[in-house]
Amino acid sequence: MEPAREPPSRARPPPPLAARPAPAPAAPRPRSPAEAEARGPEGLLRRSGSGYEGSTSWKAALEDTTTRLLLGAIAVLLFAILVVMSILASKGCIKCEAPCPEDWLLYGRKCYFFSEEPRDWNTGRQYCHTHEAVLAVIQSQKELEFMFKFTRREPWIGLRRVGDEFHWVNGDPFDPDTFTIAGPGECVFVEPTRLVSTECLMTRPWVCSKMAYT
C-alpha cells in the first residue's frame, strides 16, 4: 500500500504591516505681491472684464471718442478757413496781375473802355456808372492823343455844360487853357485836336475811364 500523502500546505498571509502615519500637510508657500493682487478682489474684477478695470476702459474709450470728434471739428474749421483765404487771395491776384478789367486798356494810372455801338450821352454815362467808372475825364493833350490811337469815331467824354460853364462828371474843374471847346451844345465829344459840344441826344460811341487797380 502507498503511504498517505499530506495535503498541500496553504501559503500564509504576510503579517500585517504597521500602520504608516499620514503625511503632515505641506506648509503654504508665501505668495508674491503680484499673485496676491491677482487673487484679490480687484484682480477678480480685472479678470472678469468688469468693475474697476471695466470702468477704466470705458472712460478711456469715451475720452478717445471725444478727442477724435474735437480733432475732426478742428480739421473742418481749418479747411473752411483755407477755402475762404484761397478765394480772397485769388481775387487779390486778379487785381494785381490785371490792373484793368477784361476789354479795358491801361494808360498811365487809368483804365479805358472804348464802346463800339453809338448811344446818346446819358446812356453812355449810365453804362460807365454800372462798371464803376465815368465818361472819360481828359486831363492832358497826351491823354487825348492816346484815345485817338484806339478810336476814330469821335466819342462822348465826361464833360457837360452846366449853365455857362463846363464841368467834368467827376467834379474836376475844366481848364479852358488846356482845351478849347467848339459848338453851342451841352454835351461834349472829342475830335483829334479839339473838343466839340453838341446836343446830348445825338448818338455816338463813348469812352469810360476809371483808376487802375493797385
From Swiss-Prot:
Domain C-type lectin, first and last residues per copy: 107-209
Region (Disordered): 1-56
Main location: membrane
Record keywords: Disulfide bond, Lectin, Membrane, Phosphoprotein, Transmembrane, Transmembrane helix
Bias (Pro residues): 10-31
A single GO molecular function term of this UniProt record: carbohydrate binding
Domain of life of the native organism: Eukaryota
Subcellular location: Membrane
PROSITE patterns named among the record's database cross-references: C_TYPE_LECTIN_1, C_TYPE_LECTIN_2
Disulphide bonds in the chain: C128-C208, C187-C200
Membrane-protein topology: Single-pass membrane protein
Membrane-crossing segments per the record: 69-89
Listed Pfam families: Lectin_C
Keyword Disulfide bond: yes
Residues carrying Phosphoserine: S32
Gene Ontology cellular component list: membrane
PANTHER family in UniProt: C-TYPE LECTIN DOMAIN FAMILY 2 MEMBER L
Name under which the protein is recorded: C-type lectin domain family 2 member L
Lineage of producing organism: Eukaryota, Metazoa, Chordata, Craniata, Vertebrata
